[in-house]
Design a protein with these regions (language model features):
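Bacterial N-terminal signal peptides that target proteins for export
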Residues: 1-9
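Beta-rich carbohydrate-recognition and catalytic domains
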Residues: 22-139, 144-186, 193-246, 264-306, ...
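Conserved positions at the start
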Residues: 32-35, 73-75, 138-140, 186-189, ...
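A structural signal for short hydrophobic beta-strand segments in well-ordered beta-sheet cores
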Residues: 37-38, 78, 143, 191, ...
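Signature of short aromatic-glycine-proline-rich micro-motifs recurring in repeat-based ectodomains
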Residues: 248-262
Length: 516
């Protein structure tokens, strides 16, 4: 049998030495400022930004221009209700031209596809405003629809953040509804509802200065849509409070303009922009990242980073591995002469002397056993090598199973993005290979998983890795041959991996990635 051994690339080495490195990973041209919540419409994802227009994507990973939004203005948001897409945006304000007088306007269309015959924006009108003198600047609108009610938050550092209620059937302001002040010292707000709590997210810090911007996203919560909103320390948002959700890291600065992207089955993500991506000329760029929940609070997760990992089942704690014969690591395993192992029976009396122990009988653990004192130098035992482990591997396809992680080569997986293979919201597709080889994990037409001798780029060898809201991961092949429904890697038993429909209520389909 012949194995292909691969040298570590610079990217893989970086991923090993800097785990969890945050980077704006989206492909294409994701250049935008103040993006609206990412939304799906007629086969594409869309987001709109300040100044009109926006971005679109077929898979949520590679983005390009082409989205159309009339009206200009700043910091739009979008929501779908029934057969309508409502778009809110602000005209004026924001300190532009030295003023804070602004109007929040709403329009709607039945599709966001500019090539569709149904693409036509219909004006609803002004739903909120500021006169430039009052303690509010009516920009940065954001929608929330919950329990049959449609709400809109808006505002910036110049005064209060406010919430008003709209008619979900028309998008107009409900007659007689008055704005409620809910926060200060933030802008670019958004709202969520979860488990009886309303969450108000806002962007703190400075904006619009590239790598010198200090934008960061913070949150408070309330049992009522109108507040009072407080953070995890009990500080009201009306007094400047806010629990950190995400800030800049690595070579990206100034995250702002949160937008929830709920993909279902325990997968939530959020869109935002970075004020500056230092690997893209410090331009403002779109990013999509996992959203986690901890103790009732949202936390920004990290998109999966390439590297070499143990893949551990949340169900059993056992590791995914090749189903091959176990190769022993040869170390001393016999006890030395003249004494029992620790905890063993005491020495027996010598013949003819009942109840007496010979003076020469050894006491305690003898030298020479692995539990006894060493008789020579203490030296590290090297890990088993790939060549040693693979000597017993068969050729052709090899199945997989799960077992206690024992730092064996057949339990170590290298995971790397596949160029030009597309992706899914926030990330590219990955290949999963046994470390140091090209042997790749693949889905079969029988809804099982095997490893094939070499990665070919076939869709059943491409893997989607989504972080779930509890921090574990869901692993899914891009395609299962002859199967239309999406399936996920699942622990059918403590030691048996398979492919099955993902169950968000079970640990069977949840996995962890640990550095070996």
């Amino acid at each position: 049998m012949k194995l292909t051994f691969l040298a570590a690339t610079g990217l893989a080495l970086l991923a090993l030495t800097v785990p969890g490195r945050i980077a704006a990973q989206l492909a294409g041209e994701p250049y935008i400022h103040d993006p609206s919540t990412v939304i799906w419409s007629d086969g594409r994802y869309y987001t709109f930004g300040t100044g009109g227009g926006g971005l679109m994507s077929e898979d949520g990973y590679t983005w390009h221009t082409g989205a159309v939004r009339p009206g200009g203005g700043v910091a739009p948001d979008v929501i779908k209700l029934g057969d309508r897409y409502y778009v809110a945006y602000a005209v004026g304000g924001g300190g532009m031209s030295g003023g804070h007088a602004s109007n929040v306007k709403i329009m709607w269309t039945k599709t966001l596809d500019p090539k569709s015959p149904d693409f036509k924006f219909n004006d609803v009108g002004v739903v909120a405003s500021s006169d430039g003198v009052e303690d509010c600047d009516a920009i940065d609108p954001a929608f929330l629809y919950v329990k049959g009610h449609l709400y809109l938050s808006y505002g910036t550092y110049f005064g209060n953040i406010r919430i008003v209620e709209l008619d979900p059937k028309t998008g107009k302001r409900i007659a007689g509804n008055k704005p409620v002040n809910v926060a200060i010292d933030m802008e670019a707000t958004d709202m969520m509802y979860r488990d009886g709590w309303y969450y108000l997210l806002g962007t703190h810090g400075t904006c619009c200065d590239g790598a010198n911007s200090s934008y960061n996203i913070r949150v408070g919560r309330s049992r009522s849509i109108t507040g009072p909103y407080v953070d995890n320390m009990g500080i009201p948002l009306l007094k400047g409070g806010g629990k950190l959700v995400v800030d800049g890291r690595g070579r990206v600065f100034g995250p702002g303009h949160f937008g929830l992207l709920d993909l279902g089955d325990g997968v939530q993500k959020f869109s935002m922009h970075y004020e500056a991506d230092m690997d893209r000329s410090a331009r403002s760029v779109l990013d999509i990242r996992p959203l986690l929940w901890k103790d009732g609070w949202p936390v920004g997760g990290d998109n999966f980073q390439s590297g070499t990992y143990e893949i551990e089942s949340e169900r059993s704690g056992w590791a995914l591995e090749l189903a091959v014969d176990f190769v022993r690591i040869e170390t001393m395993r016999r006890r030395g002469p003249g004494g029992p192992p620790p905890g063993g029976p005491p020495p027996q009396p010598a013949a003819g002397q009942p109840g007496q122990t010979p003076a020469a009988a050894p006491q305690g653990p003898p030298p020479g056993g692995f539990w006894g004192p060493p008789t020579g130098p203490v030296t590290p035992i090297p890990d088993q090598t790939l060549a040693q482990d693979s000597a017993v591997w068969p050729s052709g396809n090899i199945g997989v199973d799960m077992y206690e992680y024992m730092i064996r080569p057949h339990q170590k997986w290298t995971i790397t993005p596949v160029p030009d293979a597309g992706g899914y919201p926030g990330s590219p597709y990955f290949k999963i290979t046994i470390a140091g080889t090209d042997r790749a994990l693949a889905a079969t037409a029988e809804s099982e998983v095997v490893t094939v001798p070499a990665f070919t780029g076939a869709p059943e060898q491409l893997w989607r890795i989504d972080q779930l809201t509890d921090g574990t991961y869901r692993i899914m092949p891009k395609l299962v041959p002859n199967i239309k429904e999406p399936l996920a890697l699942t622990a059918a038993g403590a030691s048996t991996p398979t492919l099955a429909k993902f169950d968000p209520t079970s640990d069977k389909g949840r996995w962890n990635f640990r550095k070996p």
